[in-house]
A protein has these predicted regions:
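Phosphate/NTP-binding elements of NTP-utilizing enzymes
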Residues: 1-233
Length: 235
């Protein structure tokens, strides 16, 4: 059983590292295709560069090469942000995918990572109770828990939406706005324009995608990022 001093030291270390690299590699696991099972989440250099970018900049864009793990890394980062969020200032995450299934996949990744985080990060009283079963963990952490929406006891919220003019309807004060497969979103500029006003002051925007020609949203945003006009692209 972990003691209070160690808890405080670990929490302080995890909180102070805004990239969440320490948190992810220390406490989270992910599926390792080579070993055919879940293993400790050891980040690759490209994934670390991505985390440094989104931690440092308000707007970031990343190329998602096949099996690069960028979406998974983003999900792990968001889970860490939620676990470390101040209940007096909870975060809201809006995930917009080119399909609802894609957006739901990211919410599912976030949920799975949240379940991995030690209970004492949330509440020491929970840690002292018998919360090892998934049912107890679910009731302890979540008010709403499904593939389209997560609402946690600390006030944080994660919402999955498909792209469209109403993608952000009913969601405000967004702390993290994430576009997954942004290059494949139809009428991408319009979707972006309608969703951007939901982002709160100091909020962040992340675009992730595999390239899809010279589309109006992702390609143009990436081009501007390379020219240092708007977004930052991790190198």
């Amino acid at each position: 059983m972990i003691d209070m001093r160690t808890m405080a030291e670990e929490y302080a270390r995890a909180y102070s590292d805004k990239t969440r690299i320490y948190f992810i590699e220390k406490y989270l696991s992910t599926f390792n295709a080579d070993k055919g099972k879940k293993t400790q989440f050891m980040l690759f250099p490209r994934q670390k560069a991505f985390l440094r970018s989104i931690a440092e900049h308000g707007r970031s864009i990343a190329i998602k090469h096949r099996q690069a793990g960028i979406t998974t890394t983003a999900g792990a980062f968001i889970a860490c942000e939620i676990a470390l969020a101040d209940p007096e200032s909870p975060i809201t995450v809006l995930v917009i995918g080119n399909t609802i299934d894609l957006a739901m996949q990211m919410v599912t990744k976030i949920r799975e990572f949240l379940f991995q985080i030690p209970l004492w990060f949330w509440d020491f009283e929970l840690y002292k109770k018998d919360m090892e079963s998934p049912i107890n963990r679910k009731s302890a952490l979540f008010k709403i828990c499904n593939t389209k929406e997560l609402i946690l006891k600390n006030g944080c919220r994660v919402v999955a939406r498909s792209s469209g003019p109403d993608a952000s309807r009913g969601v405000g004060g967004v702390t993290w706005l994430i576009f997954d497969e942004a290059a494949f979103i139809e009428n991408g500029k319009d979707v972006y324009a309608s969703a951007l006003p939901t982002v709160s002051t100091g909020g962040h925007v992340i675009m992730i995608s595999t390239p899809n020609g010279k589309d109006q949203l992702y390609y143009e945003t990436y081009r501007q990022a390379k020219a240092c006009l708007l977004y930052t692209s991790p190198s």
